[in-house]
Regions:
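A short, surface-exposed loop/turn module that caps and links secondary-structure elements
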Residues: 28-53
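Juxtamembrane/interface motifs at transmembrane-helix termini
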Residues: 45-46, 61-63
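Enriched for short, Lys/Arg-rich terminal
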Residues: 1-5, 9-24, 35, 54, ...
Length: 83
């Protein structure tokens, strides 16, 4: 059972603004978590979401275990992501 990855409009725009090499790393990491996301992501403190670390970048997401969806909310450099 694999999860479907859905990008928010904001996350898709943020991904497209990154360098091609970084885009590839993030997409490769997202493909890896489709089978068992809990093994790769960290729960955010005080927030219902999760984060995935990809080098200096963070991917903020929400995981719907019933519908098997991973909603990518935000993608940004670690110094800007939590602002």
């Amino acid at each position: 059972m694999t999860y479907e990855i859905i990008f928010s409009d904001i996350a898709l725009t943020q991904l497209k603004k990154l360098e091609h090499k970084i885009q590839e790393r993030i997409i490769k990491s997202l493909e890896r978590i489709r089978i068992r996301p809990e093994a790769y992501v960290t729960k955010l403190v005080g927030d219902p979401g999760y984060r995935l670390r990809v080098g200096d970048y963070r991917v903020i997401m929400d995981i719907d275990k019933e519908k098997l969806h991973i909603l990518i909310i935000k993608i940004s450099h670690r110094k800007n992501i939590y602002k």
